[in-house]
Amino acid sequence: ANMNNPLSARNFIPEWCSVVVRDRNHPSIVAWTPFNETWERPDNDEAALQHDRMVEDVYALTHSLDYRPVNDCSGNYHVITDLWTVHNYEQDPAKLAEWLVVKDGRYPCQDPKRDVPYAGQPFFIDEYGGIKWVVGKEFSEISWGYGQGPRTIEEFYQRLEGLTDAIL
């Protein structure tokens, strides 16, 4: 949803409330994530204020409906959040490990000019890997993913294991 469009916000808020109320007693829900990858967060000050206000309002509204943590924007451009989440699809395990190093007391973020500063929240990589691969094909129009696709199942598992080990 384009959070800078008042009609989108007007439609999203009641639908989001109904989702939280409907599912708040479900035992498998450990956190609420109203937004994913808010790439449309503008650099323009006025539009950025609208975006941030929408995120802040939905965060507060979610907390008013349930006690669980709220991950405001999964992956990037956090405004107010109980969980610090990032998405990283680096395909080289060594580069991923280097990216994850805490520098100056900060976990990595996608864009320091757009993200609020990290404030000690639990840190999650909630998306990674995304390995491009179609069994038996080096490249295919139907394949989707990141990096050069592996040539064998063994190469796929080796890359996945390397990326996972870099995180752990």
Give residue ranges: language-model regions.
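Substrate-binding/catalytic cleft of secreted carbohydrate-active enzymes
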Residues: 1-168
